[in-house]
Amino acid sequence: MVANNIPDDRSYTDEHEWVMISPGQTSVPSTPVRVGITSVAAAALGELVFLDLPDVGSDIEAGQSCGEVESTKTVSELYPPVSGKVTSLNQAAIDDPSLVTQDPYGTGWLFEVQATQLGPLLTAEVYAEKNGA
């Protein structure tokens, strides 16, 4: 763990998303990877009330908006850290968006992707430094 509970077992984006890809990994994983938002994003958003996630089977592109998270404060777009095909959604989080803010790195994950290409990724340490975490 790095400061502000930023787990160091995954990679991050400047847009405050994480992906379960080992830091420094440059090859595309052969199995689907989980995607979620960071604790920094969750804290800034506050109480989440709605998740608009990409459909299973849809193709998404790293860095291009693929959905939204809506809180009592604002609506924020989701920018996936990888390109690929969405293989599953976290139905528990869709049914109860508070899971995303309560446990963004565990039960609050958003969706899984069979990645075809990695976007620009950061280590936990770099992400924490950039975000004062």
Tell what function each PLM region has.
Residues 1-65, 98, 103-133:
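Acidic, low-complexity mobile loops and tails
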Residues 19-22, 72, 89:
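Residue-level recognition of beta-strand microenvironments
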Residues 42-43, 85-86, 92-93:
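Short, charged/polar surface micro-motifs in flexible loops or helix N-caps
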Residues 46-48, 72-75:
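A short beta-loop-beta micro-motif enriched in histidine and acidic residues
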